[in-house]
Amino acid sequence: MPVLHASGLARTFPTERGTVEAVRGIDLTAERGEILGFLGPNGAGKTTTLRMLTTLLTPTGGTATVAGCDLVRDPAGVRRASGYVAQSGGVDPHVSVREELVTQARLYRLGKAEALARAEELAAGLGLDGLLDRKTATLSGGQRRRLDIAMGLTHRPEVLFLDEPTTGLDPGSRADLWELIRRIRAEHGTTVFLTTHYLDEADALADRLVIIDKGVVVAEGTPEALKRAHAGSPGASLQDAFLALTGSGPAPQGPSPLAV
């Protein structure tokens, strides 16, 4: 049984000019231990879908489960089974790495001694063990992203949602984070749901891709299968396939007027 399953997932928003259909019936699955890339141009519905799957937004149609827990009937169960790393992160710049990790563990009701042990375990596993007593404000961009991911893994989730995890990182830090994501999957069997605007990243990391546009799924499959089916020539890139499917290039970096 897929660890993540959505059927007809939809979300509308009322506006002064009428109802906006941000997501119009998305079907998708992710298997245990799979890295699933979720792609689409700005306004395609990626953000809305991710917010629904992480219980931050209630669907107006369809159903979805995470680790067998229904988004609407059991949102607490979904949150117990999920880790979520937002694009902007969320660390307190005035505390140490250790304090941030312990606080996160305590939020998941770990005892003080267990929380301290879990903080050290996460730091060792994610290359932060030499930084435990550093203030988070002094960390590099790559180190902060590792801390964000460590916080998302505190409660050993079955599914880890990563929203644009390498945005703003230099090439070396991006490569390091790619390797970390692969290792998390390999060592723990964690399912990773990855949104990204970097098509080289999706090509390198994802076992399978779901591409959406205008609130619906327009294609899914392995990166190689999508390139063969939609890029139009041998040796074509994932970007060629993406352009053919959506009629637009990767969304520009930086804020958009309305992210749905």
Report residues per predicted region:
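Conserved ABC ATPase "signature" region
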Residues: 102, 106, 113-131
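Conserved ABC ATPase signature
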Residues: 135-139
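Conserved catalytic motifs of ABC-family nucleotide-binding domains
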Residues: 156
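Catalytic Walker B motif of ABC-type/P-loop ATPase nucleotide-binding domains
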Residues: 160-163
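Helical segment within the ABC ATPase nucleotide-binding domain
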Residues: 175-188
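ABC ATPase "signature
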Residues: 220-221
